[in-house]
Design a protein with these regions (language model features):
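Non-globular sequence segments
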Residues: 98, 104-157
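Glycine-rich, flexible loop/turn motifs
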Residues: 5, 70-73, 116, 121, ...
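Generic hydrophobic/aromatic pocket-lining and core-packing "Φ" positions
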Residues: 45, 89, 149, 157-160
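Aromatic side chains
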Residues: 42-44, 77, 145, 157, ...
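N-terminal capping/small domains of soluble enzymes
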Residues: 1-104, 141
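Short acidic/His/Gly/Ser-rich catalytic and metal-binding motifs that mark active-site loops
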Residues: 64-68, 110-113, 169-171
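Short beta-strand segments at enzyme active-site cores
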Residues: 56-59, 99-104, 155-169
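General structural feature for long, well-ordered alpha-helical segments within catalytic domains
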Residues: 81-84, 88, 134-137, 141-144, ...
């Protein structure tokens, strides 16, 4: 039986992981309240890349301001976030790890006090006081996910992963 964990893994886009160890996206709550990258989050993630992960994924990065799921969440919903993401992607890649950002919208799980408004969902959900999105808002959400992916590409990430679990907007 061969050990494949230490073997490279190539993707069709041309990126290659030096090994098959991947850092899962975790909730760090270390970034600034406006979604910009903090030194703490940068240090935490680049330290993991330095530790030998073949792929290092960021924590969930929200694609709309009203999609924030927790305090200190990294954002990617505005061009003000690009500088920090460029720094982070470069810092991760400097250690030989692929850099991937997780795109996220907390949907009905966005705390009202955190987003200063009512959470949104595919339909009204009384349990979470979430209101259903209008068709126009669905189209805007689609555009915002695409724009976030473009910001990730501009920032130098090797890829994106879309968070679709836990009752979030794309569950």
């Amino acid at each position: 039986m061969s050990n494949t964990t230490k073997k490279p893994l190539s993707f069709s886009c041309g990126a290659t992981m030096p090994n098959r160890f991947m850092l899962a996206p975790m909730t760090n709550t270390q970034s600034h309240e406006d979604g910009t990258l903090s030194n703490e989050e940068y240090n935490w993630l680049t330290m993991r890349a330095q530790g030998g992960f073949g792929l290092t994924m960021t924590c969930a990065s929200h694609v709309q301001a009203n999609g924030k799921g927790f305090p200190g969440q990294l954002g990617i919903f505005s061009d003000i976030h690009i500088e920090g993401h460029k720094r982070l992607a470069a810092g991760i890649k400097a250690h030989g790890s692929l850099a991937v950002v997780q795109l996220h919208h907390a949907g009905m799980r966005s705390p009202e006090d955190l987003i200063e408004g009512q959470p949104v969902s595919a339909s009204d959900i009384k349990k979470h006081n979430a209101r259903g999105l209008s068709l126009g808002e669905v189209q805007q959400l689609k555009t915002d996910f695409i724009d976030a992916a473009k910001r990730a590409q501009q920032s130098g990430y090797d890829g994106v992963e879309v968070h679709g679990a836990h009752g979030y907007i794309l569950t």
